Regions:
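Conserved, mostly hydrophobic/aromatic
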Residues: 30, 84, 130, 244
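Acidic (Asp/Glu)-rich catalytic clusters
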Residues: 45-48, 70-82, 121
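Glycine/small-residue-rich loop that forms an oxyanion/phosphate-binding "nest" at active or ligand-binding sites
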Residues: 90-123
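A short alpha/beta connector and helix-capping loop motif
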Residues: 35-68
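C-terminal domain-boundary segment and adjacent tail
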Residues: 161, 253-274
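Catalytic beta/alpha-barrel core
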Residues: 55-60, 139, 160-167
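Active-site-adjacent beta->alpha loops and helix N-cap segments on the catalytic face
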Residues: 39-40, 62-73, 141-145, 168-175
């Protein structure tokens, strides 16, 4: 993974990490992935504390009804909304990289994003960003052609949409060379390896499910652009947006702690804006 590029169209330059003397960062989560979480109020509770929602749009989860419900939740909470496309693989929740032709993948991504855009248009809502899900997210980090396929799908729908990718990944430069704006993402609730990759979820300590630990990591990222790796080494990561995973146990409590600690540290939590 190429680390910490100087990115021409990066939001760290367009928006800035500072507005005046105020540090700013976005707080995002993946929403609308489970009808059960929508029904029991879990997504609604999490939505209270984030500023951007990545909405499942049919590839790994979600349908027209859940998209509409999630968009309405976002409207009620003044949360910016984005598309969360994946490999077309509902059976595996988009967690496995599929070996399919690039043209088919690009068309699938475009179809997923377009479906959410159509639902949003009916509700008079604008889709601000696109963040790939699961295996597609990591494939974009590793494979330039897959990143280009995603970028071209976004360009064909709305070239003003922001594409979210992992901070330090070469995919951000690929999106920028296509003419897209990008947002570099870091993770409040995931452990980092010394090379800057996320710790495998199958290993102990991969997920920071303590609100205090996640909030401390978020503050370090938001104020200093630094995070401690599992080895104890300090990594430098410049991020425009922080992610809290909705499937992390106690995700709403984590998001609340992150937002409160960021505010206490003088960081304004503000949504991505196209």
């Amino acid at each position: 993974m190429r680390r910490f590029p100087d990115e021409e169209h990066h939001l760290a330059e367009d928006r800035g990490k500072k507005i005046g003397m105020v540090l700013t960062i976005d707080l995002n989560a993946d929403i609308g992935e489970s009808p059960e979480r929508l029904a029991d109020g879990s997504d609604a509770e999490l939505m209270r504390y984030i500023t951007s929602a990545n909405i499942a749009c049919g590839g790994h989860a979600g349908n027209a009804l859940t998209m509409e419900q999630t968009l309405e939740l976002a409207r009620q909470n003044n949360v910016a909304v984005g598309a969360h496309p994946s490999y077309p693989d509902r059976n595996n929740f988009g967690r496995i990289a599929l070996n399919i032709p690039l043209a088919d993948l690009q068309n699938s991504i475009a179809d997923q994003v377009s479906e959410l855009v159509a639902v949003a248009r009916r509700l008079k809502t604008t889709i601000i960003h696109v963040k790939p899900h699961g295996a597609l997210y990591h494939s974009c980090n590793r494979d330039a052609e897959i990143a280009r396929a995603l970028g071209r799908a976004v360009l064909a729908i709305n070239p003003r949409m922001i594409v979210v990718g992992q901070a330090g990944s070469a995919c951000l430069s690929i999106y920028q060379h296509l003419g897209l704006r990008t947002a570099a993402e870091a993770f409040a609730d995931r452990a980092y390896e010394p090379d800057g990759s996320l710790r495998n979820r199958n290993l102990a300590g991969a997920v920071l499910d303590s609100p205090e630990c996640a909030a401390a990591q978020a503050v370090s990222l938001g104020t200093q652009g630094r995070v401690l790796a599992t080895s104890g080494a300090e990594l430098t990561i410049s991020a425009d947006t922080l992610c809290v995973h909705s499937d992390t146990p106690g995700s709403a409590a984590i998001a609340r702690a992150v937002r409160e600690r960021l505010a206490a540290a003088g960081v304004a939590v503000r949504a991505l804006r196209a």
